[in-house]
Amino acid sequence: MNSCDGGSGLMAKPSRDKWLYSTFPISVATGPLGTMVQLYLIQLNGQALGTIYGGLASAIYNGISIPAALFWGLTIDRLHKRKGLIALSYAMVAIALVSFYFDRSTGGTIARYSVISFVSLASATPLNLLIMETEQKSRWAGAFAKLSLVSSLGNVVGLLVSVVWADLLPAQLVLLFVPMGALSVTSSALSVVLIKEPEFVLERETLAARRPSFFTRLLANPVFFITIPSLSDFRRAFRGMRSSLTRGVPLFYISTILFYVSSGLFNTSFVPAMHLYSVSDQEVFAVILAGMAVQTLSFQVAGRFVGDRNLVTTSVQGLLLRGWSYLGIGVAALLLTGPIFVAPALVLYPIAGGLAFAIYYTSANTMMFTTVHSKSAGAALGVYSAVVGIASMSGSFVSGFISVYDGYYVTFILSGVLLFTAVAVIGRLPKPSSRDESALQ
């Protein structure tokens, strides 16, 4: 296999990144997917059971990403056909989306949502590898930024379509899965036409060697394995807690656990809460759209904002901003009744899911990038991915039960408290040395 620097000596060639636009239709299709599934489960089962089933669906969706990442990682190592895997992934997503319309059972809905989680990961790594395999190294950063932007804009357009659909056909939400499936087929066809198999292939670990590729891959899905972590890897990751010299990595993992448990708790119950307060489906999609739009814009400036500041400080700022937003939504859920709940949701959710997430994500993944390069990359990334997957799954699973039996406001306030706890943990991290900072360049 060639190294990631293998193309550095090539003569300048025109950019061959038109294939990146094949990701746009499927991003449109999957942008509103989680919201659609949650609303549909409530339609099928009512508010209480629909919320619990929504939590179960989200938990399985997050949990299945762990074996999916392992399976597709091994497949990529053995089958060096980028175009085939990407086209197959999109086609399988299309089949799963269209099948929502024909099997309208709760079990079938949860199963298909889980299938989409599994098959969509087949394309995440090949897409990022293709950039490094087909573009000159000087163009990598720009190509990764374009891939991220095209995907995000697709999600925004998908949510915008959902807002219009919910206004025109409010009783036919399930029918929306059919055009979303057609868009996925379009992406599959475009990938076959536009993607050219690279002249040389790279190993998966090269994605962890460069910050742009590392960030873009984790943004697509934060679960990414180079090797399968062993029990000793987990023990080593948390063993240094007792010493002030070695506690940085364990504290970082603990703060990550708290963040993703909090995210699972909040995100799983947020849509059902709006439905409980008689917020229309159109307005629900509009709130999620606002969050995605702000997130897309925030990521365009987050790198520059974080780059000039201490990483621990910016991580704390992102956590505090998100935590106070969650707490504000929790207080609103406690004090308000009826559709007026959409007002604080429309203000605070874009702050939490957009601006605060972009700041925290950029800061935390920069620290993770440093961790990967200061230790065994495969082990460190494997532990991180397992931690993220399990934490997200756990938060999603208990979210529905807490909301139904104790109240949605309890779920949201607890989500904020967990983030404040993460602030206390991450605030104990040692400030990065100049050596660490240079490793991030």
Where are these regions (language model features)?
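Juxtamembrane intracellular "pre-TM" segments in multi-pass secondary transporters
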Residues: 4-14, 197-253, 441
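Hydrophobic core of transmembrane alpha-helices in multi-pass small-molecule transporters
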Residues: 24, 107-123, 257, 341-359
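Structural signature of the two symmetry-related core transmembrane helices
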Residues: 84-98, 313-329
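Glycine-rich segments within core transmembrane alpha-helices of 12-TM secondary carriers
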Residues: 144-162, 385-395
